[in-house]
Amino acid sequence: MKIDPKNGIADLIFGMKMTHVEHLLGEPDRQFHDEDDNVIYLYNKQKLRLTFYADEDLRFGYAITSYPNASLLGQAIIGKPVGEVIESLPFTTWETEDFDSVTNHFNESNWLTIQSEFGAIIRVEIGALIDDATDSFIWRFKG
């Protein structure tokens, strides 16, 4: 499963509607609304959580995965040492935040979070970018 910064994950492109995603992945294993009334799809086999933003016409805008073969810029990263992976990436600015045994490593320019526990990557979060000038999402999907 390819994590594609700024664009999406696997065959899913930021800006897709739920029908586009269902066409590619099928019905989700679970679906619910979060506290902001966004629609959340969970796909167990792919270890994938997708967010469709309520205030953006239910467009796909955020993904979380812990899929064992998830890759970022050509390298598998789940279970790998977080320090080695971050050093190997071309992204230079990272914000780090600790929560108990978990550490989030956030790169704002790619809206990418690499989450680690005990020094190993356990999941990756990626979101659609926001245009600073217009304060609106940059939707890569044009269909």
Task: Give the location of each predicted region.
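Helix-adjacent hinge/juxtasegments
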Residues: G61-S71
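Short, recurring structural edge motifs at helix starts
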Residues: K6-D11, A70-Q75
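A short, surface-exposed helix-loop junction/capping segment
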Residues: M1-P5
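A cross-family detector of function-defining hotspots
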Residues: M16-L58, S71-L72, A76-G143
